[in-house]
């Protein structure tokens, strides 16, 4: 072995112990050496740490900017978008480590969304979580039960959030939880036909603890707790809870309180039915929700009450076409992949909106109507050659008639003419 080879054998990486021959590069420092592999590994570790640090300290958008982002995906509901933008901004500003609040403790303000089915409650919460880049989960209040009953514990909500945060506890503790159908756990003693079982109030009691802020013991695999299993501790103090519900009949309770007559010759007529409903909801007060069946302690954990308007037919037409991820745009993209230009007439869009209004399903019903009407077409189009354009008219929606197909040959003939 030559002297040069002996020197190469003696030079080793101070971190991994590999010799100079075993690596591509070996960089020398004062009495230490580092190889190219260790440099690459260190770079990855530093990058991961940097991403984790910047994720929690990224610049928070101002309320106006948050609302602008919501405008791209949620049609109308201006009042609700403003209220949510301010509430979310204040919540995450409170968690901002750069803002000194040691002299004054800023408490968390959870949010209650009230509005009919398909008005955008869930979409608002989902859109907020996506732009804020925080873990998000949706829980159904109707599946929750208090201890001792068959069903899910409230801690399973936190487990779902933890799973969406890839079991990063610190990240989950800054997340957003949306609890849907919250009105279904209300006690309605004045109307026994729609009263939930006795566990309804128990669920409210269990929820208010995690909503206010507690150190929740979460079973990593879900299910009911038992003493032998290990638990993950999650502090819910900084988790933002958004609860949503339709609260059917709440408008009548509000009208009764403000003294408006809803039937008879002396009834106050203010226009369309949805206008009356929207005007009534805007007058909601905590006492109305307590009469509806929410216990005062639970309502106290939801200081911000936001009402959403019932959508009109014109609003539904806008929802079909205007948002960034509008349904019509989604279908057009699917057809574009097949090389077909998909077009809906104005009357077809109005018919879809009208059907959704009749079904009383709001924006949620638009997709099911379109999917039903487009099924045969989406089945046939990939197998048909030469189709360049497809026009969906009113009769396609109403009577499931075949749409107008324009073939490539016909287009060529038009150009020649």
UniProtKB/Swiss-Prot annotation:
Domain ClpX-type ZB: 1-54
Listed InterPro entries: AAA+_ATPase, ATP-dep_Clp_protease_ClpX, ATPase_AAA_core, Clp_ATPase_C, Clp_protease_ATP-bd_su_ClpX, ClpX_bact, P-loop_NTPase, Znf_CppX_C4
Domain of life: Bacteria
Binding site for ATP: 116-123
Disulfide cross-links: none
SMART domains: AAA (SM00382), ClpB_D2-small (SM01086), zf-C4_ClpX (SM00994)
Binding site for Zn(2+): 13, 16, 35, 38
The UniProt record lists the keyword Zinc: yes
GO cellular component, as recorded: HslUV protease complex
Keywords per UniProt: ATP-binding, Chaperone, Metal-binding, Nucleotide-binding, Zinc
GO MF annotations, alphabetized: ATP binding; ATP hydrolysis activity; ATP-dependent protein folding chaperone; protein dimerization activity; unfolded protein binding; zinc ion binding
Free-text function comment from the UniProt entry: ATP-dependent specificity component of the Clp protease. It directs the protease to specific substrates. Can perform chaperone functions in the absence of ClpP.
NCBIfam families on file: clpX, PRK05342.1
Family: Belongs to the ClpX chaperone family.
Protein name, entry field: ATP-dependent Clp protease ATP-binding subunit ClpX
Organism: Desulfosudis oleivorans (strain DSM 6200 / JCM 39069 / Hxd3) (Desulfococcus oleovorans)
